[in-house]
């Protein structure tokens, strides 16, 4: 959810630092949503892996996305938007609300994110199957996923069983530094 702010004044009210990315809980998400009520907002699917897969699909390359969404409007939007972009969605529906990044652009062009991981953070290794990987050539893993060791190891194992190569988007230097042993 993207909103253009009229000033920087509401960051204190939302509990966010301007220019950063902060993981937020559902309570803070609701607080930010209340600030967004009076603003024009735009919905877009996203996340680094989702953006990469959508870009590849738009180039005509068969692409799929494995993830977890909630049974809600954001989850439905994500599924439909990804499919509109030509991505085969392999989305598990969970009980928790769908994740979303509340994205704020201030008048000076600075962007700030309040990211609620939601259902996406509850995807677990046992929910993956080799069938999800069949028919593809490459498994692309978002860098922040390396923090869930059992999930990433299972995904890589199943991808290898299905004959895929593995690609890592390491996101930032600190992800590499903090997770060097697993990489």
Feature locations, PLM:
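A glycine-rich beta-to-alpha transition motif near the start of alpha/beta enzyme domains, typified by
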Residues: 34, 63-89
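A general structural signal for well-ordered alpha-helical segments in protein cores
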Residues: 49-53, 75, 152
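Charged, low-complexity surface patches
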Residues: 45, 71, 148
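Short, well-ordered alpha-helices that flank and scaffold nucleotide-derived cofactor binding pockets
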Residues: 54, 58, 80, 157
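Glycine-rich phosphate/adenosyl-contacting loop at the front of the ribokinase-like
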Residues: 1-64
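Conserved beta-strand edge residues that scaffold enzyme active sites
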Residues: 70-71, 96, 173-174
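Ribokinase/PfkB-type carbohydrate-kinase core domain
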Residues: 1-19, 41, 81-93, 103-183
